[in-house]
Design a protein with these regions (language model features):
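Conserved short histidine dyad/triad with adjacent acidic residue
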Residues: 39-56, 77, 87, 96-98
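Conserved hydrophobic/aromatic beta-strand scaffold that supports enzyme active sites
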Residues: 28-30, 40-44, 61, 84, ...
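Short acidic-glycine-tyrosine-enriched beta hairpin
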Residues: 75-106
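A short hydrophobic beta-strand segment most commonly corresponding to one strand
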Residues: 94, 107-126
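Glycine- and acidic-residue-biased ligand/ion/polar-headgroup-sensing regions
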Residues: 56-78
Length: 149
């Protein structure tokens, strides 16, 4: 499978209305989801758009394949920005659970491969958050696996 131009990928697009003060427009395509809690997923950001403010509740690795991914770390207690970084094509990172941040596609968007590992319980992957840090929704392996059957 060529991740850069596979026409068989099933993309799910997420856009939001006026509920957020930043433009949300991204798509994801699940490559593999396994019973052992491993998920491989491609995420594509539209130019200068965000995904939801979120906290990773699973171990995660990512590789930027195209474009730039702008990451802003946030202190969940105060809501203050802790720092910003720009990840470019070829950048790889591995993080333990607990990382809280915003992600935004650069001027030409971004395409990123994520590998998540959540082996326990329902397999909590990511919590989408409101600006105040309260949880809007939780993504789980259990729900993903159920939808794929």
């Amino acid at each position: 499978m060529n991740l850069l131009n596979d026409k068989t990928l099933r993309w799910k697009r997420c856009t939001e209305g006026d509920d957020f003060d930043y433009p949300i427009d991204y798509s994801d395509a699940i490559l593999d989801a396994r019973e052992d809690g491993r998920l491989e997923i491609l995420v594509k950001w539209e130019p200068n758009c965000y995904c939801h403010f979120h906290r990773h509740t699973a171990e995660i690795s990512s590789l930027v394949l195209e474009g730039e991914l702008h990451v802003t770390d946030i202190d969940i207690e105060t809501g203050k920005e802790l720092g910003k970084r720009v990840r470019v094509a070829g950048d790889f990172v591995h993080k333990e659970p607990g990382d809280v941040h915003m992600e935004q596609g650069g001027a030409n968007g971004a395409l990123v491969l994520f590998n998540l590992y959540a082996p326990e319980g329902e397999g909590k992957l990511v919590e989408s958050l409101k600006k105040d840090g309260s949880v809007i929704s939780v993504s789980t392996m259990e729900r993903i696996l159920r939808k794929r059957k």
